[in-house]
Regions:
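Short alpha-helical segments enriched in small residues
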Residues: 1-142
Length: 142
């Protein structure tokens, strides 16, 4: 079984091979991704930092998510995961960003986004600007 530390170390190795630095924008995880990554020796070579944007106002203030976008789609949605990743990259010197927004529970879910709904976003900086933005939705249980 792969542990969080194994995944974090492999992430660091892949980033090091490419000469990239990672930034995260986290909501429901409250900085857990950043904490896990920084436990790896040498993480300062490839980990830029983290924006912990638990509240809606933090998403706006820290990574520039539009209040109108939040009103239109809600905090747990594909457009917000995308905007968080793009905003983290735009507000840092990192090469790649990952965002996480979701409903950890035990309350707060609804029919469209039940507890356990998580959206991830990734954005990569290229010579022409922020490119290659991708998102993925997952539903976790327990």
């Amino acid at each position: 079984m792969t542990t969080d530390d194994d995944l974090a170390a492999r992430t660091g190795q892949a980033l090091t091979r490419r000469g990239w630095r990672l930034i995260s924008a986290e909501s429901c995880t409250g900085g857990l991704l950043a904490a896990t990554l920084t436990e790896i020796p040498g993480a300062s070579d490839w980990f830029e930092g983290a924006f912990v944007t638990y509240r809606l106002s933090a998403k706006t203030a820290m990574v520039g998510v539009s209040p109108a976008l939040l009103d239109r789609h809600g905090a747990v949605s594909e457009p917000i995961a995308r905007a968080m990743a793009e905003g983290a990259l735009a507000n840092s010197d990192a090469d790649i960003a990952v965002s996480i927004t979701g409903i950890a529970g035990p309350d707060g879910g609804d029919v469209l986004s039940p507890v356990g709904t998580i959206w991830f976003g990734w954005a990569i900086r290229e010579d022409t600007g922020i490119q290659c933005v991708q998102t993925a939705e997952h539903h976790l249980s327990g």
